[in-house]
A protein has these predicted regions:
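Glycine-rich Rossmann NAD(P)(H)-binding loop
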Residues: 13, 165, 189-195, 223-230, ...
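Conserved Rossmann-fold cofactor-binding substructure of NAD(P)-dependent oxidoreductases
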Residues: 51-77, 86
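Conserved beta-loop-beta element that borders a ligand/cofactor-binding pocket
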Residues: 144-167
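Mid/C-terminal beta-alpha module of Rossmann-like enzyme folds, strongest
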Residues: 211-272, 277
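Amphipathic terminal alpha-helices
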Residues: 291-298
Length: 298
């Protein structure tokens, strides 16, 4: 284990995505000496001042070649092949915080996995997870969690929902903004836009990661990540239009007919996707840094 006699050391795997810079800055504010490990394909001025290790975080050989026998007080794994990273760094770090995703929950992509159809509302960390009879991606996400705790039993694992904000490579709200910029007077959405979904503003998601770093006693378990308020589609549309000074009618249609809304909704079947954040608040001490209603307009 690390025995550094000066500042604590922190390794951030990733560091240049939607939540990376805020995580790096938060660790520095906690007096950690931060190193970023990523491929080097997407550099960012916000984290250019810290040590960078460039390599392949997706393979065992790549992680070993990049990190060798280096040790760290804290590892925050936001990128790469998590099951490989967890195994290679076993015994080389004091604390391990990792980021996964809500597809670990059974039915997150396909709510027909439940009878009657629909995810549990709210979905807590103990909800059924995806199995081999679910879609392959969801099962692999859940299986990776198992492999993580095999190698890092005291890890804190965070289940990200869809993250929005700066540097998001697939900004769903662009589907709304583009129509506003085009001067459209209406937008088609399923079921009058009443579906509610927990998402996470990038600054808020990074704050959960930092709360996890601050709470080592919570090791060995998973936590949901998200804004404290789960907005409906119609609310997101209204907030964006208000910010841009545009009026646009929400035209509700049955889900089967609202095909133009598929890229915005990112799901075929209707249903709420609301995460239970009770443990995140009560155990990790999380509270929104930016409210969902404010963040949507940023």
């Amino acid at each position: 284990m690390p025995t550094s006699t000066d500042r604590s050391t922190a390794l951030v795997i990733g560091g240049t995505g939607p939540t990376g810079p805020a995580i790096v800055q938060g660790l520095e504010a906690r007096d950690h000496r931060v190193t970023v490990f990523h491929t080097g394909r997407h550099e960012l001025d916000l984290v250019s001042h810290v040590e960078h290790i460039h390599g392949d975080p997706f393979s065992t050989d790549g992680v070993v070649a990049a990190l060798g026998n280096r040790t760290f007080d804290v590892v925050v794994a936001c990128y790469g092949r998590l099951r490989v990273i967890a195994e290679v760094l076993a015994g080389q770090c004091g604390r391990f915080v990792s980021v996964g995703g809500t597809p670990a929950y059974r039915g997150y992509f396909d709510p027909t996995r439940f009878d009657p159809i629909g995810l549990p509302v709210p979905t807590g960390e103990d909800a059924p997870r995806s199995g081999e009879d679910d879609d392959g991606k969801s099962y692999r996400v859940a299986r990776t969690e198992d492999r993580l705790f095999e190698h890092q039993p005291d890890a804190i694992h965070l289940r990200y929902p869809f993250v929005y904000g700066p540097r998001q490579i697939a900004p769903l709200d662009w589907c709304i903004v583009r129509r506003v910029l085009d001067g459209r007077s209406a937008i088609i959405v399923p079921d009058a836009g009443l579906m509610a979904e927990t998402r996470a503003y990038s600054e808020n998601a990074a704050h959960v990661v930092l709360c996890a770093v601050d709470t080592p006693a919570a090791g060995g378990r998973c936590f949901n990540v998200g804004d404290e308020e789960s907005l409906t589609t119609a609310q997101r549309i209204a907030l964006i239009c208000a910010e841009l000074g545009h009026e646009m009618e929400v035209v509700g249609m049955p889900t089967d007919l609202a095909l133009p809304a598929r890229p915005l909704m990112m799901q075929v079947e209707p249903g709420h996707r609301i995460l239970d954040l009770s443990a995140t608040r009560d155990v990790l001490g999380y509270r929104d840094l930016v409210s969902a209603r404010e963040a949507v307009g940023i």
